[in-house]
Design a protein with these regions (language model features):
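Hydrophobic transmembrane alpha-helices of multi-pass small-molecule transport proteins
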Residues: 120-139
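Hydrophobic core positions of alpha-helical segments in small-molecule transporters
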Residues: 35-36, 68, 95-96, 123-126
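Membrane-interface interhelical linkers
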Residues: 1-8, 25, 30, 41-66, ...
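Alpha-helical transmembrane segments of compact multi-pass small-molecule transporters, enriched
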Residues: 39-43, 95-110, 129
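Structural motif at transmembrane-helix junctions in multi-pass transporters
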Residues: 25-29, 79-98, 114
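Hydrophobic alpha-helical transmembrane segments of multi-pass membrane transport proteins
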Residues: 8-15, 19, 64-87, 137
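Alpha-helical transmembrane segments of multi-pass membrane proteins
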Residues: 13-16, 100, 104, 134-135
Length: 142
């Protein structure tokens, strides 16, 4: 099931990046960020109300660093819009994917933020290198 969720996430993130960039051209970058965060909040509140199984009272037991997810969302929306607006969808998302994979590799390799430490070996580095070469080939001018 994890693969299905990852595919849905990847498609959704690409669509969101394009939609946000296009909306930003009409109403402004920060205004779009507000709309995105607000609609996300409303939808999440409805879903949480009907199907939520957690407890907001447990937030006092959470690592306070992990509360920065919303602030990171603002950074993500801003930077995705600027990258897609400046480089186009495919190139922008390609660079984003490489950066995500590198960051995830570092998090795994060092077991950061309480995650399980997962070895990052030669074949992982080769995979990232192949992605980088792929982006270079993709943008190569004829």
């Amino acid at each position: 099931m994890g693969i299905i969720y990852a595919i849905i996430s990847g498609i959704s993130m690409s669509l969101q990046g394009v939609f946000n960039t296009k909306l930003g051209e009409k109403i402004g970058l920060w205004e779009t960020n507000v709309i995105v965060q607000l609609t996300g909040l409303i939808l999440t509140l409805v879903i949480s109300f009907f199907w939520g199984k957690g407890s907001y009272s447990n937030i006092k037991n959470a690592n306070k660093l992990f509360l920065l997810g919303g602030a990171l969302g603002v950074v993500i929306i801003f930077t995705v819009m600027k990258s897609i607006g400046g480089m186009g969808t495919t190139f922008g998302i390609g660079i984003i994917l490489i950066a995500q994979l590198l960051a995830a590799g570092i998090i795994d390799a060092f077991g950061l933020f309480g995650t399980e430490k997962i070895k990052f070996c030669l074949h992982e580095f080769l995979g990232i290198a192949i992605m980088i070469v792929g982006i270079i080939i993709f943008k190569w001018k004829h």
